[in-house]
Amino acid sequence: LWSKLFNEYMVAYGEAMDNSVSRTNRVFIDGGDRAEQINFVRQQLTSNRPSWHRMMVEKGIPERLKPLEELSRNLWWCWTVAARDLFESVDAELWVKVDRNPIALLDKLSSTRCEELCNDTEFLKQMDAVYKEFTEYMSEKPSPEHAKVAYFSMEYGLHSSLKIYSGGLGILAGDYLKEASDRNVGMVAVGLLYRYGYFTQRLSAQGAQEATYEAQNFFKLPIMPVRDEFGNWVTTQVAMPGRTLYARVWKCQVGRTDLYLLDADYEANLEEDRQVTYYLYGGDWENRLKQEILL
């Protein structure tokens, strides 16, 4: 039924459009003993053309559970036992499935479970206690008398959900940021935001080692675009031979420590330059050099 209806609809619609255009192409005005023909310029029918726009759809959670959202956006939770336990208690099975990523956890949480949590007095009490600890922690600011510290590293091992590290150096750098936060040191860190991060290894059916990469969805990570007072995405740039390399700036909250991550994978760059922030320690020597220059 629908296939017949649709086909007939398209035929009728086409005839209607043809008749409409033929009527608007020429108009005759009676002027005494003759008819004056006025030609009109056919205008483009823009109303029948799709207009594509990018949009982000974010799942909202009940107002009573908003503290969970704020906690998920700051990596303070990952080295605070009470906060980790809080997220696990939201849905223990789902917590494991999303690799202990609280942002992904809240995104996949069902409305039924949200309603249950809103009516769970013990859970709400636990959440309020953790959130109070967090807000008190964040309210303490570094002394203005202390020197500011700028920390640069190719990798930061902060949590497994943020794949911008490979091993020892990254874990050490991540621990520096966490310790700086706990000691209330005025530190600002800078690194690169890798689209694919570092490879993981697996064995093929023949027993050979294979490297696999998985693209990160930046909007499912504890990072946010840095914007200026006009709402524009803050960028930085570096001169390269015959061109300019651009990088967008993202911000990751590591407790009280701000970590700024540079991302070259967007339309302003040539394809070869977009690959600068594809892989940690990936690509040829020239790409490695570009990474160092950008940082």
Question: What residues fall within each predicted segment?
Answer:
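Catalytic cores of carbohydrate-active enzymes across secretory and cytosolic contexts
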Residues: 6-295
